[in-house]
A protein has these predicted regions:
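Membrane-helix boundary connector in multi-pass membrane proteins
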Residues: 83-100
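Membrane-helix boundary/interface segments in integral membrane proteins
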Residues: 48-65
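Structural signature of hydrophobic alpha-helical transmembrane segments
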Residues: 37-47, 102
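Membrane-water interface at the C-terminal end of transmembrane alpha helices
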Residues: 88, 108-125
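Membrane-helix boundary elements
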Residues: 18-38
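Hydrophobic alpha-helical membrane segments
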Residues: 70-85
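Short, highly charged, low-complexity non-transmembrane loops/tails of multi-pass membrane proteins
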Residues: 124-138
Length: 138
Protein backbone atom coordinates (compact mmCIF):
# COMPACT_ATOMS: atom_id res chain seq x y z
CA UNK A 1 0.00 0.00 0.00
CA UNK A 2 1.35 3.36 -1.04
CA UNK A 3 1.20 6.15 1.54
CA UNK A 4 1.19 9.62 -0.02
CA UNK A 5 -0.12 12.18 2.44
CA UNK A 6 1.71 15.40 1.51
CA UNK A 7 -0.30 17.11 -1.21
CA UNK A 8 1.26 19.21 -3.96
CA UNK A 9 0.41 22.55 -2.33
CA UNK A 10 2.12 21.50 0.93
CA UNK A 11 5.03 20.14 -1.13
CA UNK A 12 5.37 23.55 -2.78
CA UNK A 13 5.46 25.32 0.58
CA UNK A 14 8.10 22.87 1.80
CA UNK A 15 10.16 23.35 -1.37
CA UNK A 16 10.40 27.12 -0.96
CA UNK A 17 10.85 26.94 2.82
CA UNK A 18 13.59 24.29 2.77
CA UNK A 19 15.31 26.04 -0.15
CA UNK A 20 15.38 29.34 1.75
CA UNK A 21 16.60 27.65 4.95
CA UNK A 22 19.42 25.97 3.02
CA UNK A 23 20.50 29.29 1.50
CA UNK A 24 20.62 30.80 5.00
CA UNK A 25 21.94 27.65 6.75
CA UNK A 26 25.63 28.65 6.72
CA UNK A 27 24.78 31.61 8.96
CA UNK A 28 21.97 29.95 10.93
CA UNK A 29 24.20 26.98 11.87
CA UNK A 30 27.45 28.98 11.81
CA UNK A 31 29.39 27.04 9.20
CA UNK A 32 29.91 29.97 6.79
CA UNK A 33 33.68 29.60 7.36
CA UNK A 34 33.63 26.08 5.82
CA UNK A 35 33.62 26.90 2.12
CA UNK A 36 32.47 23.55 0.74
CA UNK A 37 29.65 23.19 3.28
CA UNK A 38 28.55 26.77 2.70
CA UNK A 39 28.46 26.59 -1.10
CA UNK A 40 26.79 23.17 -1.21
CA UNK A 41 24.00 24.43 1.06
CA UNK A 42 23.55 27.65 -0.91
CA UNK A 43 23.72 25.88 -4.29
CA UNK A 44 21.27 23.15 -3.33
CA UNK A 45 18.92 25.71 -1.75
CA UNK A 46 18.91 27.82 -4.92
CA UNK A 47 18.43 24.69 -7.06
CA UNK A 48 15.43 23.70 -4.94
CA UNK A 49 13.87 27.14 -5.31
CA UNK A 50 14.51 27.14 -9.08
CA UNK A 51 13.01 23.66 -9.40
CA UNK A 52 9.95 24.76 -7.41
CA UNK A 53 9.48 27.78 -9.67
CA UNK A 54 9.54 25.51 -12.74
CA UNK A 55 7.30 22.72 -11.39
CA UNK A 56 3.77 22.19 -12.64
CA UNK A 57 1.95 22.52 -9.31
CA UNK A 58 -0.05 25.14 -7.48
CA UNK A 59 2.97 27.19 -6.40
CA UNK A 60 4.99 26.80 -9.60
CA UNK A 61 5.45 29.72 -11.97
CA UNK A 62 6.77 28.30 -15.26
CA UNK A 63 5.07 24.88 -14.85
CA UNK A 64 7.62 23.05 -17.03
CA UNK A 65 8.52 20.12 -14.75
CA UNK A 66 5.83 17.47 -14.12
CA UNK A 67 5.26 16.78 -10.45
CA UNK A 68 6.35 13.13 -10.63
CA UNK A 69 9.68 14.27 -12.14
CA UNK A 70 9.98 16.93 -9.44
CA UNK A 71 9.65 14.28 -6.72
CA UNK A 72 12.40 12.17 -8.30
CA UNK A 73 14.58 15.28 -8.47
CA UNK A 74 13.85 15.98 -4.78
CA UNK A 75 14.94 12.47 -3.81
CA UNK A 76 18.14 12.76 -5.86
CA UNK A 77 18.89 16.22 -4.46
CA UNK A 78 18.28 14.84 -0.97
CA UNK A 79 20.70 11.96 -1.54
CA UNK A 80 23.32 14.35 -2.92
CA UNK A 81 22.88 16.69 0.05
CA UNK A 82 23.08 13.85 2.60
CA UNK A 83 26.27 12.49 1.00
CA UNK A 84 27.86 15.89 0.32
CA UNK A 85 29.93 16.03 3.55
CA UNK A 86 31.86 12.96 2.34
CA UNK A 87 31.83 13.88 -1.36
CA UNK A 88 33.26 17.35 -0.68
CA UNK A 89 35.37 16.47 2.35
CA UNK A 90 33.76 18.46 5.14
CA UNK A 91 32.60 15.47 7.22
CA UNK A 92 35.56 16.02 9.55
CA UNK A 93 34.49 19.60 10.28
CA UNK A 94 32.28 20.41 13.24
CA UNK A 95 28.89 18.76 13.55
CA UNK A 96 27.27 22.12 12.78
CA UNK A 97 28.83 21.96 9.28
CA UNK A 98 27.85 18.47 8.16
CA UNK A 99 24.81 17.48 10.24
CA UNK A 100 22.37 19.98 8.62
CA UNK A 101 23.28 18.57 5.20
CA UNK A 102 22.63 14.99 6.30
CA UNK A 103 19.40 15.76 8.18
CA UNK A 104 17.89 17.94 5.45
CA UNK A 105 19.01 15.51 2.74
CA UNK A 106 17.39 12.54 4.45
CA UNK A 107 14.27 14.62 5.15
CA UNK A 108 14.06 15.50 1.44
CA UNK A 109 14.18 11.83 0.51
CA UNK A 110 11.44 11.07 3.03
CA UNK A 111 9.27 13.98 1.94
CA UNK A 112 9.58 12.94 -1.71
CA UNK A 113 8.58 9.39 -0.77
CA UNK A 114 5.35 10.47 0.94
CA UNK A 115 4.35 13.33 -1.40
CA UNK A 116 1.55 12.90 -3.88
CA UNK A 117 2.38 13.50 -7.54
CA UNK A 118 -1.24 14.52 -8.16
CA UNK A 119 -2.73 17.86 -7.18
CA UNK A 120 -5.88 17.77 -5.06
CA UNK A 121 -7.31 20.74 -6.88
CA UNK A 122 -10.28 20.25 -9.16
CA UNK A 123 -9.06 22.61 -11.84
CA UNK A 124 -6.44 20.46 -13.55
CA UNK A 125 -5.75 22.19 -16.81
CA UNK A 126 -6.25 20.41 -20.10
CA UNK A 127 -2.53 19.88 -20.66
CA UNK A 128 -2.18 18.11 -17.30
CA UNK A 129 -5.18 15.88 -17.99
CA UNK A 130 -3.75 14.91 -21.37
CA UNK A 131 -0.24 14.45 -19.99
CA UNK A 132 -1.35 12.13 -17.23
CA UNK A 133 -4.43 10.76 -19.02
CA UNK A 134 -6.57 11.63 -16.03
CA UNK A 135 -10.19 12.75 -16.30
CA UNK A 136 -11.24 16.01 -14.70
CA UNK A 137 -12.60 15.57 -11.22
CA UNK A 138 -16.25 16.38 -10.62
Amino acid sequence: MEVRFIDTRAQGVLDYLVGAVLVLAPWIFQFNDVAAAKWVAIGVGLAMIATALMTNYELGVAKLIPMHVHLVMDALIGAFLALSPWIFGFSDEGTNAWLPHVVVGLAEIGIAAVSSPWPRRDDLDRREREMFNRPARA
